[in-house]
Protein backbone atom coordinates (compact mmCIF):
# COMPACT_ATOMS: atom_id res chain seq x y z
CA UNK A 1 0.00 0.00 0.00
CA UNK A 2 1.42 3.34 -1.04
CA UNK A 3 1.55 5.58 2.02
CA UNK A 4 1.14 8.66 -0.18
CA UNK A 5 -2.27 7.30 -1.15
CA UNK A 6 -3.25 7.06 2.52
CA UNK A 7 -2.64 10.79 2.87
CA UNK A 8 -5.13 11.51 0.07
CA UNK A 9 -8.00 9.05 0.48
CA UNK A 10 -10.62 9.17 3.21
CA UNK A 11 -13.42 7.04 4.55
CA UNK A 12 -16.35 7.21 2.11
CA UNK A 13 -18.81 7.22 5.02
CA UNK A 14 -17.45 9.97 7.30
CA UNK A 15 -14.50 11.42 5.33
CA UNK A 16 -12.25 10.47 8.26
CA UNK A 17 -8.68 9.18 8.17
CA UNK A 18 -8.05 5.58 7.15
CA UNK A 19 -5.41 3.34 8.73
CA UNK A 20 -3.69 0.51 6.85
CA UNK A 21 -3.74 -2.98 8.37
CA UNK A 22 -1.03 -4.82 6.46
CA UNK A 23 -1.75 -8.19 8.07
CA UNK A 24 -5.40 -8.22 6.97
CA UNK A 25 -4.93 -6.10 3.83
CA UNK A 26 -7.63 -3.64 4.91
CA UNK A 27 -8.09 0.07 5.39
CA UNK A 28 -9.60 0.82 8.78
CA UNK A 29 -11.88 3.70 9.74
CA UNK A 30 -11.74 3.93 13.53
CA UNK A 31 -14.57 6.49 13.65
CA UNK A 32 -17.08 4.21 11.91
CA UNK A 33 -15.52 0.90 13.02
CA UNK A 34 -15.35 -0.27 9.41
CA UNK A 35 -12.71 -2.21 7.49
CA UNK A 36 -12.45 -1.72 3.73
CA UNK A 37 -10.75 -4.52 1.76
CA UNK A 38 -7.82 -4.22 -0.62
CA UNK A 39 -8.09 -6.36 -3.74
CA UNK A 40 -4.90 -6.78 -5.74
CA UNK A 41 -3.52 -3.78 -3.85
CA UNK A 42 -6.48 -1.57 -4.79
CA UNK A 43 -8.68 -0.14 -2.01
CA UNK A 44 -12.37 -1.00 -2.38
CA UNK A 45 -13.95 2.04 -0.72
CA UNK A 46 -17.58 1.02 -1.03
CA UNK A 47 -19.70 1.01 2.11
CA UNK A 48 -21.45 -2.22 1.10
CA UNK A 49 -18.04 -3.95 0.71
CA UNK A 50 -16.83 -2.92 4.18
CA UNK A 51 -17.06 -5.17 7.19
CA UNK A 52 -17.80 -4.04 10.72
CA UNK A 53 -14.93 -4.31 13.16
CA UNK A 54 -15.33 -6.60 16.13
CA UNK A 55 -15.30 -5.02 19.58
CA UNK A 56 -11.74 -6.34 20.12
CA UNK A 57 -10.56 -4.84 16.83
CA UNK A 58 -12.18 -1.50 17.66
CA UNK A 59 -10.19 -1.25 20.89
CA UNK A 60 -6.80 -1.63 19.22
UniProtKB/Swiss-Prot annotation:
Gene3D superfamilies: 2.20.25.10. InterPro entries: Trm112-like. It holds the Pfam family Trm112p. GO terms for cellular component: cytosol. SUPFAM superfamilies: Trm112p-like (SSF158997). PANTHER family: PROTEIN PREY, MITOCHONDRIAL, ZGC:162634. NCBIfam families: PRK11827.1. Belongs to the UPF0434 family. This is UPF0434 protein YcaR. It comes from Salmonella arizonae (strain ATCC BAA-731 / CDC346-86 / RSK2980). The lineage of its organism: Bacteria, Pseudomonadati, Pseudomonadota, Gammaproteobacteria, Enterobacterales.
Amino acid sequence: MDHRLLEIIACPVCNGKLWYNQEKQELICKLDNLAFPLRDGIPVLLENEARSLTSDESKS
